[in-house]
Each structure stands twice: as C-alpha cells, then as structure tokens.
Design a protein with these regions (language model features):
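Short acidic/glycine-rich loops and adjacent helix/strand connectors
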Residues: 1-162
Length: 162
C-alpha cells in the first residue's frame, strides 16, 4: 500500500463565510481515511474587511497595486492568523500524529485566467512560523498557490476540477 501521509486541508469559498479544515490519511492512491473536520466562521468584521479590499479591485493591474498596500499586508496577516487559530483547534482530531503536509488555499482576491493571473491573500511563510510551536506540526510542509500554479500550467486556476 505504501507510505501513509497525514494531510490537513484548509479551504475557503467565495461566500466568505469561513474556513473549512479537514485532516485525512492517504497513500495518494487507493487509501483515504478522514480523521476530522472543523469549520471556523469569519467574524462580520473580518468578512467586511475582505469584501472591502476585494471591492477595490476591478482589474489585474489594480490587484497588483493593492497587494503593495499596508491595508493588504495587515489583512493578509489577520487572515493568516485566523487560519492558524483554526489549525490550533483541529490538530487534536488527528490523534496527535504528525501532519506531513498542510494545504493552504488562502482567500482569492482576484482571479483572471485570461490574464494568466490570480492572487490569494494569506502568507504561507508566516503560517509556517506560527504553527511551529505545535509538536505535531513543526515538521509539516505547507503547500500553497494552487490556482497560480494551475494557471501557469495552462489551466483555469481550478486545479481540483477537470
């Protein structure tokens, strides 16, 4: 059957209601077992901040400019720490076993496949540092930029759909 990996997936949607967290074990092929799910709802304040910054972006160039702003940097940190809190809540569901990989989606601010551009807010490097204090997460690899990598490989930025 091969090595069994433990993975933690973090996912948000366009509704901006919150983040879903799931822990699975898999060998990447025929074996899959769900260990736990959790959901952390955005506060109205955080939801409004996300909607506010998204409303300022109507083009790829505007997105490229806004991600240089202090408003963006502050919101990115807040979103990253929100994810960290959700991770803190769910790590117990994994039975205390080490998490091999964390799939960090972030929140899509702008998505324009025809421009070969997409941008998700959230900082994987900061997330990695913030979870290092948890024994079963300190060696976890964080993967991110799913949409960007899909677009760069001729996809539409939806790597989980055919």
């Amino acid at each position: 059957m091969g090595k069994i990996y433990t993975a933690l997936g973090l996912m948000s949607g366009t509704s901006l209601d919150g983040i879903d967290f799931s822990i699975i074990q898999t060998n990447g092929k025929e074996y899959l077992s769900l260990s736990g799910n959790n959901y952390l709802e955005f506060s109205n304040t955080l939801r409004q901040k996300i909607r506010g910054i998204k409303s300022k972006i109507t083009s790829t160039n505007e997105c490229k400019e806004i991600i240089k702003s202090d408003e963006y940097k502050d919101l990115s940190n807040e979103i990253t720490m929100f994810h960290q809190e959700g991770i803190r809540q769910i790590v117990g569901y994994g039975g205390g076993r080490p998490i091999d990989v964390i799939a960090f989606h972030g929140i899509t601010l702008w998505h324009k496949p025809s421009d070969k551009y997409t941008h998700q807010i959230g900082d994987a490097k900061i997330l990695k540092k913030s979870i290092a204090k948890y024994k079963n997460l300190k060696n976890s690899e964080i993967i991110f930029n799913f949409r960007k990598n899909d677009i760069l490989n001729e996809g539409q930025g939806a790597p989980l759909t055919p």
